[in-house]
Amino acid sequence: MNNLPKELPIFPLSNFIIFPKTTVPLNIFEPRYIDMINYSMKSNKLIGMIQPKSSISNTVPELHEVGCLGKITSFRETEDGRFLIELKGLIRFVKIKEIKTENKYRMLEVDYKKFSQDLENVKEDLKFTDLELIFKDLKSLFEKKGFVINWKALEKQSLDETINALAMASPFSLEEKQMLLESKNLDIRKNKISQILSTYTYDIYDNTTVQ
């Protein structure tokens, strides 16, 4: 963990989270983030993903306290100058402070100690039977919102991969996704998903919005 960078270029993306041990594709087209990826590719291939807060009152939105360090594992430049990358989550971090920079992209000083377990290969004691009700409610919610998910493929993944993939792809709000990202471990995250789903229950089954 001592080898991890304490200062990170960051990609603030609303309603988007990435977890350790998950990989996501990203389409980079804004000039400032093209510059950020160029910088990262020439150094350690690492960037930080973090959500801006919902109450945006200016052009430089305030950031949430927790994000995730990601490593660029695949890179391709398109004919029109966009970057298509794949980013693998490594470890979550806590924001310490923003660093002043002349770059157009933002930089943070971060700390990883709170989430050091993200680097460990410890299998948490959960079974698919623990997820059956959550899985059923999530499937109903995804279908209602028009989300297409390959459920058969998910069932073949490990439990942490399944829970994290569903949390990332879910139609939950920015704040709900942030709450899942900040959950200390998989069991807490599973319970948080269950709590969030309970607020959608009437909307799913009775066509009555309770939010």
Give names to the regions the model predicted.
Residues 1-149, 175, 179, 186-189, ...:
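Positively charged
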